[in-house]
């Protein structure tokens, strides 16, 4: 190819020459940190299964702090948090905890200052505190010093009284920590009348709050706050479903405020449904059908169908086609993955979910990259993907649809006896894509073939994605070598993602090449990882 880069010449300033004389994308410590913040591993593999976090997983983070770049690390933590770039929340909170325990004073100060921004809900704050406790011994440092006490106090004080009341009554405790613990240990001095009421409620209980404030002249805000706390207390004590419904409607109480017994009432569920967020609604469809909240033709079914057909609502809730597809397949099955819950799916809801699946393609933001997807079409793709209710072939078909419908330049190929084009058009349904996949005679899933095929056919691609079960057979050419050859010939700094959807672990990605990523399993968080990797965020 005329004008193509020699393999010994980097395609971009981010590439370096490796030990074999080929060019790879250098993995810097900042790149490793970003991977860790996104999915909890500094290496080139995303695992669906929860990985235990420890200092041994965060060597690049430690090196950056030791090199005097701790404040840059905090900036990365904040931007990952604010822009929602994390597939899992824990690595972000772990990294913040490490920074807050380190020896560098500037990093520590920046970490504590970032606590209210990064720990947006109490669950995050409790997790951060627990990580600090876990790290105390290995990092040989104290914990409840003045800096942490101030950070925790600021977390409460920077919110209004009503905002704190809403979150502390919804997220009461996690990881062995409660609000009462944090208020006691932080020696909080409330910054407002509203906060004084809430902190007294947490530490002393409703009875003392009621006694102290019943005769006092209060602001409108404080009155509203007391009424809300009274409603939260009332709902805990009442067995009367009508009163529960009234309190839900008047004070926007949510499921977390209710007792288990309240949730046995279908009328209570009907009240909760009115303001239920879409993500919670998708999660609870089976339960609400099983307990007869949703019955053929009733107004609740109509409400759900209406919400699922509302494009603005779907976009605002950031519902991805995958979220809907998982809800659809779970609901269609008529039973949960675990437990004894069973239901008969409502046909109108099934239709609404099916329609919402196609509607949500419009809400996916394109990356503007050229994709080449390579799909394993073997019978073993009918196994369930790790971390999902979907089988591997359904995940692959849906991903082909997502890319075809959102990216202007994309191609799909299938592993037959050789690589063959597998046209997926924007008007195809999921079933049509699956049927077409079944008609392709299956061949070996040699992960180097997509790059070899693209090089032979002069197909330009920024990102190659292989979808397979756990068959990641490497032929005569290693995928890393095929990718480097493709970069050299086409003069494109292309990337490769291999999704082994039923695999517990495999290694194809060159750990020293930032343009390669392995994925073991496939869950909804995997979508964020793919997007971040494609857009060069990680």
Swiss-Prot record:
Gene3D superfamilies: von Willebrand factor, type A domain. The keyword Acetylation applies. Pfam families: TROVE, vWA_Ro60. The modification N6-acetyllysine is found at residue 224. Keywords: Acetylation, Cilium biogenesis/degradation, Cytoplasm, Metal-binding, Phosphoprotein, Repeat, Ribonucleoprotein, RNA-binding. Its main location: cytoplasm. It is found in: Cytoplasm. Residues 16-369 form the TROVE domain. Disruption phenotype: Cilia absent or reduced, virtually no cilia of the normal 5 uM mean length. The modification N-acetylmethionine is found at residue 1. One of its GO terms (cellular component) is cilium. Residues 361-538 are annotated as: VWFA-like domain. CDD domains: vWFA. GO terms for biological process: cellular response to interferon-alpha; cilium assembly; immune system development; regulation of gene expression; response to UV; smoothened signaling pathway. Highest in brain, followed by lung, muscle, kidney and heart. Lower levels are found in testis, liver and spleen. Identified in a IGF2BP1-dependent mRNP granule complex containing untranslated mRNAs. Found in a complex with PUF60 and Y5 RNA. Interacts with RAB11FIP5. RNA-binding protein that binds to misfolded non-coding RNAs, pre-5S rRNA, and several small cytoplasmic RNA molecules known as Y RNAs. May play roles in cilia formation and/or maintenance. The horseshoe-shaped TROVE domain is built with 7 helical HEAT-like repeats, and is closed by the VWFA-like domain giving rise to a ring-shaped monomer. Single-stranded RNA is bound in the positively charged central cavity. This is RNA-binding protein Ro60. The lineage of its organism: Eukaryota, Metazoa, Chordata, Craniata, Vertebrata. The gene is RO60.
